[in-house]
């Protein structure tokens, strides 16, 4: 493995249960977290020790989405619906009852929110008017993860039936079904140039799909010992990271798909349990990770170190 210098910048605590999700905020140094304790917190990478409680919901939260145009944070309230939170005032602006199931992911594109649910539905919402536009039901198994491709106008959704389904962003027609994994798909992620779709899930395989060739399989890598929970690129698109139930974060070269670094507890004071979600910020390219161990870690990754560890 090539040398990548890893430095742990901060260990953030405050949540009282497993931390399931992260979302970027209105500026590069701001981000949000939510957990099994129903708490939504705001953090500043310039002073990561000073968290701020933004909202407290009754049930666990698996999904957050920040809408930049409105300055609102959308929280997926499991077994209920979504809550629109004015983060500046720390007040709820609106809510929408959606489902009795869990809400696993929320993404947005222009005036639309896409919500992945445990019932297998992907619910399309007109967020400025807080109303349901469409319910896409193509599986009885959970819809777990969503990625938006504005170039090809595609919406990729990973399901617990091991398939990735690709929908047209305008018509909501199903345009492709990828028999992708042997078990649940937990993460789908487009490359920043939208030429590749990466996926990972319970089978611990990292899969790469060629978008320009109608999502033909390009590569399959046994990437982790246990389930891959999340995949995210750095802002420039030169590298990406995967995180897993095996407690590790792995750093990859995006062009060669070469594994560059393993970040874990023994070598880097990493997480002690499953790493659930990551956020690669544009604030000094810092990487943020959240875990079942109730902590958030902030990392600096140097790909051009002047000296080796």
Which residue stretches match the model-derived regions?
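Residue-level detector of Asp-centered blade-edge/turn motifs that repeat once per structural unit
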Residues: 26-27, 68-69, 108-110, 150-151, ...
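Short loop/turn segments that connect beta-strands within beta-propeller blades
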Residues: 45-48, 87-90, 127-130, 169-172, ...
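Conserved strand-to-loop turn within each blade of WD40 beta-propeller repeats
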Residues: 34-37, 76-79, 116-119, 158-161, ...
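WD40-repeat beta-propellers
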Residues: 40-43, 83-85, 125, 164-167, ...
């Amino acid at each position: 493995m090539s040398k990548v210098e890893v430095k742990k910048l901060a260990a953030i605590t405050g949540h009282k249960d497993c931390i399931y999700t992260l979302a970027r905020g209105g500026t590069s140094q701001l981000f949000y977290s939510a957990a099994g304790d129903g708490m939504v917190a705001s953090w500043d990478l310039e002073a990561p020790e000073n968290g701020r409680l933004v909202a407290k919901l009754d049930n666990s939260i698996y999904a957050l989405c920040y809408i930049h145009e409105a300055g609102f944070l959308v929280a997926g309230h499991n077994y209920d619906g979504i809550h629109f939170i004015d983060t500046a005032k720390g007040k709820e602006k609106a809510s929408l009852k959606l489902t009795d199931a869990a809400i696993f992911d929320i993404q947005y594109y222009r005036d639309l929110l896409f919500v992945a649910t445990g019932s297998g539905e992907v619910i399309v919402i007109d967020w400025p008017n807080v109303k349901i536009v469409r319910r896409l039901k193509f599986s009885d198994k959970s819809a777990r993860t969503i990625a938006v491709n504005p170039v090809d106008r595609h919406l990729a959704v990973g399901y617990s039936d091991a398939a990735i389904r690709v929908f047209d962003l305008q018509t909501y027609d199903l345009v492709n079904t990828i028999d992708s994994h042997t078990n649940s798909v937990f993460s789908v992620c487009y490359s920043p140039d939208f030429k590749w779709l990466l996926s990972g899930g319970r089978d611990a395989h990292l899969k790469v799909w060629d978008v320009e060739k109608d999502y033909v399989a390009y590569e399959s890598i046994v990437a982790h010992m246990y389930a891959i929970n999340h995949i995210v690129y750095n802002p420039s698109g030169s590298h990406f990271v995967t995180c897993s139930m095996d407690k590790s974060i792995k750093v990859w070269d995006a062009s060669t798909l070469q594994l560059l670094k393993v970040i874990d507890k023994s070598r880097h004071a990493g997480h002690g349990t499953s790493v659930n979600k990551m956020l690669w910020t544009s604030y000094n390219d810092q990487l943020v990770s959240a875990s079942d161990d109730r902590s958030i870690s902030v990392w600096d990754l140097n790909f051009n170190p002047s000296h080796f560890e």
